């Protein structure tokens, strides 16, 4: 619990000098399975802070899709598991991505690594876990967003076992 409080105090402190980013609040289903295999479903609650700071620009100058930006967050499940995560994300307007004209839809893939404690939930095989997520969101007039995401948590075979877990979530995103 002490680790969680320290982590939250670091990501929730005021962000001096940051132009804009998003606080992301999500709720979903942890360990979603569609292949008929056994599942240990739980409710997944997530908070992320996405910073609008470019860490690395890996693409052509005219395309802002390749700006890697940082995020940090926490996920909690109804079976007492928690995951402290930090990583990078890309973000682009879907209209701009395909037609060159902005619209209200955004595409946000992300990759992170963090500390996982399984609580009474699914045993993922290691304390260090990686998460990849694909998200689509709709930007409202006030710049808030509503999104849906699909993610996968795995230890990338660095543990003795690697069952992984899929998560589908709905999110509300508020600019800060």
Predicted features along the sequence, with ranges:
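Outer-membrane beta-barrel initiation region
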Residues: 18-57
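Residue-level signature of outer-membrane beta-barrel architecture
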Residues: 49-53, 90-96, 138, 152, ...
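Solvent-exposed loop/turn segments connecting transmembrane beta-strands
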Residues: 32-42, 74-85, 99, 121-127, ...
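N-terminal signal peptide c-region/cleavage motif recognized by signal peptidases
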Residues: 14-16
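Membrane-embedded beta-strands of outer-membrane beta-barrel proteins
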Residues: 45-49, 86-88, 134, 170
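Outer-membrane beta-barrel "beta-signal"
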Residues: 43-47, 163-176
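Transmembrane beta-strand segments that form the barrel wall of outer-membrane beta-barrel proteins
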Residues: 23-33, 65-77, 108-117, 148-154
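Repeated loop/turn-to-beta-strand initiation elements of outer-membrane beta-barrel proteins
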Residues: 23, 53-59, 95-98, 105, ...
């Amino acid at each position: 619990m002490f680790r969680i409080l320290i982590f939250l105090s670091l990501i929730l402190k005021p962000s001096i000098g940051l132009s804009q980013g998003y606080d992301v609040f999500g709720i979903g289903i942890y360990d979603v399975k569609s292949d008929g295999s056994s599942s240990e479903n739980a409710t997944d609650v997530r908070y992320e802070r996405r910073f609008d700071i470019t860490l690395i620009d890996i693409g052509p100058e005219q395309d802002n899709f390749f700006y890697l930006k940082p995020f940090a967050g926490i996920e909690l499940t109804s079976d007492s598991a928690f995951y402290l995560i930090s990583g990078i994300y890309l973000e682009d307007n879907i209209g701009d991505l395909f037609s060159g004209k902005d619209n209200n839809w955004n595409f946000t893939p992300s990759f992170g690594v963090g500390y996982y404690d399984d609580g009474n939930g699914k045993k993922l095989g290691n304390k260090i876990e990686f998460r990849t997520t694909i998200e689509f969101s709709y930007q409202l007039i006030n710049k808030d967003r509503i999104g849906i995401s699909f993610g996968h948590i795995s230890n990338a075979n660095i543990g003795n076992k690697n069952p992984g877990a899929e998560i589908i979530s709905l999110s509300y995103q508020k600019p800060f």
